Amino acid sequence: MVQTGPNIVTPANFKRCGINHLNLCLKEKAKMFKNLHNTTSMRTRMIGLFAIITLVGLFAFACGSDEEAAAPAPAAAPAAAPAKEESIAAQYIGTLEGPATVTDSSKFPSSFGEAPQLAAMVKAGSLPAIEERLPVQSDLLVIDNIEGIGEYGGIWRRGFTGPADKWNGYRCCTGPDHVLFWDYTGDVPEPNVAKSIDVSDDGKVFTLHLREGMRWSDGVPVTADDWLFWYEDMYGNEELVPNKSAVSGINGKQGNFEKIDDYTVRWTFEDPYYFFTSVLAGRTDLGGGQADRGVVGKGSFAPKHYLSQYIPDIAGKDAVDKIVADEGYDTWVNLIKFKNDWALNPELPVLTPWVTVQPINNSEWILERNAYYYGVDLEGNQLPYIDKVVLTMAEDLEVMNLRAIAGEYDWQARHLNMAKVPLYIENQEKGEYKLYFDTQDAGADAQWKVNMAYKQDMYIGDLLRDKSFRHALGASFKREQLNEVFWLGLGVPGSSAPAPANLYSPGPESEWRTKHSVFDPDKANAIFDELGLDKKDSDGFRLRADNGERLVLEITSRTAQFMEFVGMSEMICEHLGEYVGIQCTVNAVERSLAGQISAADEHMFEVAWGDGADHLFTFPGHVFPAGTNSGFGSALGLWFQTGGEKGMQPSAPLQKVFDNFEKAFGVPEAERIALGKEIWEIAIEEQWGIGIAGQSPASLGVRVVKTDLGNVPSRQYNNPDTKTPGISRPMTLYWKTEKNRAPQALSYE
């Protein structure tokens, strides 16, 4: 029960706080609600951290509209205060910007610089000259920085949550090593690991030109043989990759990959594949790179000279069996998955700007500069500028946010909680950092995912697969209240539909943002009654129609994440009990365990991510079950991946989504857009993912950055498909003052 009174905030008091008046709103609420009390367990846990910080910070998170402020403005208050606050808000949401990939070879540098430690190694004869470690001049990756040329040295301090947090490193520190990659707007594929791509007029042949002189992090040259090895001996191995990715084919027909010469490879398809360049830029099985996708045998390239020794067909079964036994693995497949794991194996040759030297299964995950990285700035200085990245494990989300508030991280957005924004604002000067908001176009920063393949309890599973039941759930909870508590009122409550400006937006916000996504307990209760859930027990909870027992739903939720999924789940459960008479419990588990539960289809629901869905065709897993880890049903994703050979047969609407998705890759843009819009129409109507709120910085967009860091964008495109902050090319970050850029000892010196 929530106390009420003149100085008490209740859910009914919450109003939306406009972003342009955020500071004013927070200050007013700090004055109004110093005596705020809330006795619910979820709220108590959520603000537990605040108790050890200032009183103003403690109570500022519950912000409301300007009209809600009870205290009259002082007589001397300037009339232009709102305009002033708008300029303050501009500190947090800046202009979208980022570094540029230079493609005009006339601007490529002809002389080169390197970190002082590497120069010393060259002088000592323990490292080849910089010219020998970089690609030939015409094949360099040249980056035009946001601010200008940087300085070498220093450490980038970050936080991570443990061995399951590999995405932390994938985003910050892999380059990213995609085959192609997005420009800073997230719209245009550009050269990256591949120097360039030629596309035939009929859209069937894609010729990739590699960078002559590029080297793996151990100094061995990268050639087309590494790509062919990946295709034939890893991706083509049925034990390692039993199910081929849909993106390596079109219209159900797999493409053919071949080596043309030492620095040229080619994909050929039977049908036009107009979207293939975007596939190679995105976080897909082909485009996503070795560091991220290599652990599952995907990613388009792999170090042949290193990984061949672990493949029985190349090294011989007896030799590989001995290694498997000596290193304690059960199969060669699990052995090579470890050997090709960027986050776990320091010996792995890679193409990333930093390489793992102390793996992720330690309290500190440590990365060091790659002496053979192929990227330079406009003056020829080899990137990265910063020597080391040190990620320190935080046992939970509260500890990580406390460290960020205290200024212990240099650039961090991952795992930072939107509810702590008042404290970040208050402590900027003391912590020597600046706060940035990186908003995104996804309609649901977080969504309530329904497992349509749930069979642990067939009665409940059938309810979950009933669209009417999902519609009733969507009308059973107050999104506005969740928005105020977990988004500070800055999100857009409603369905999972992407922002109106998105290419694939299904239509007007007035229709698709609210469709099946407005709190309407009368409607919800009527639907539940019609579904045979009209009987209740003495406590007012609905009873199952099959056995007369109480209906109990369970939401699986990940702990220690960058949004308060557990708190959201608890509030949704509270609303289900209060407004529609359904008992709901929360199963709060660690991320890796939650992934295992999801993969086994043992969960009924998840409250989890929805970000990235605006990149529909390269990051579809938060829209429908495009894979076995979407949360919507692993068995359905397996059906999609195997073309119906394995898994669970989808409903007719979901099959239509599958068909549209596969067709879209081989049609011109206008037709692809139409297919994408229809996918969203079906997804919103079917409500596999029940939207909560989105289009905000809540998911990895609350960014704190040390004021001494250079080449920092005022706003960056925020999307997992672009591996933000990877889209801002963190290898261009540098420390402006000498106190922070002392040269760091490198393990290979």
Segments the model singles out, each with a brief description of its role:
Residues G64-P72:
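Bacterial lipoprotein signal-peptidase II cleavage site
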Residues V188, K195-V241, R266-T268, M400-R403, ...:
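Aromatic- and charge-enriched surface segment that lines or borders ligand/interaction sites
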Residues D139, L348, W354, Q358-W365, ...:
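Detector for C-terminal structural segments
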Residues F59-A62:
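C-terminal motif of bacterial Sec signal peptides marking the signal peptidase cleavage site
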Residues R211, L228, K339-N345, L367, ...:
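Ligand-site clamp/hinge motif
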Residues A246-V333, V712:
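Surface-exposed binding/hinge segments that line
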Residues W230, M234-K244, N256-E258, V355-I366, ...:
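Extracellular/periplasmic solute-recognition and catalytic clefts
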Residues E114, A119-D201, E232:
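N-terminal lobe/hinge region of extracytoplasmic solute-binding protein
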